[in-house]
């Protein structure tokens, strides 16, 4: 069930989907408001019909709680088979590069930190950790500042938060190692890159997919 404060952008991130696709799949006329009692499809119409979520309360796009206070939305969908995961970027084949050169200042913690924080200076380059397509570029999620979300497959998304400058737009294809932003401290008390990896919408430790330094 969607909690008060959730938005289409948040729902997309938590379910590994492009929020604009969710708008299209549900024929939503006004993306700024989700109605009471509305059931949202979070997969294409041809997919499992069980991938729907009920709305608990109307919310506006800009009214988003801090990531530290949020709870994940768990979809009732079936897990993909081993073969389908392997075809769409399996654990065995999916590898990232470091999105920034700084040191890790905050490690992954599923209950407290949905990603890792990497230190740096204003203007330091932020790189795409793998090939993919930009599904979000903006500042619509409170607590993330200037945010970029890249979809790499039906399985994996990466998120890059607190940037000073965003250098890519939505629907743009990016290559591994491409500069997509400049590090900053938007919606943060210090300059850093908050980097998340989502597998089927669930936060996982990106360090397990990164090369050792």
Language model region names:
Residues 172-213:
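Conserved, short, structured surface segments that act as functional micro-motifs
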Residues 156-164:
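Active-site region of chymotrypsin-like
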Residues 144-146, 156, 189-193:
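A short pocket-lining beta-strand/turn micro-motif at the edge of beta-sheets
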């Amino acid at each position: 069930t969607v909690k008060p404060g959730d938005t289409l952008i948040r729902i997309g991130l938590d379910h590994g989907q492009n929020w604009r696709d969710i708008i299209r799949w549900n024929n939503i006329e006004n993306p700024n408001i989700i109605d009471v009692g509305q059931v949202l499809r979070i997969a294409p119409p041809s997919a499992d019909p069980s991938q729907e979520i009920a709305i608990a309360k109307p919310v506006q796009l800009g009214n988003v709680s801090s990531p530290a206070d949020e709870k994940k939305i768990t979809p009732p969908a079936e897990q993909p088979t081993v073969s389908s995961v392997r075809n769409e970027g399996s654990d065995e084949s999916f590898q990232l590069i470091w999105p920034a050169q700084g040191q890790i200042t905050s490690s992954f913690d599923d209950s407290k930190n949905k990603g890792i924080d990497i230190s740096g200076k204003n203007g330091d380059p932020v790189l795409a950790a793998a090939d993919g397509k930009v599904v979000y570029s903006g500042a619509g999620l409170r607590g993330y500042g200037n945010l970029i979300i890249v979809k790499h497959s039906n399985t994996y998304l990466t998120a890059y938060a607190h940037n000073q400058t965003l250098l890519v737009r939505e629907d743009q294809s990016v290559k591994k190692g491409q500069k997509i932003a400049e590090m900053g401290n938007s919606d943060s008390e210090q300059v850093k890159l908050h980097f998340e990896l989502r597998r089927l919408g669930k936060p996982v430790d990106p360090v397990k997919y990164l090369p050792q330094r």
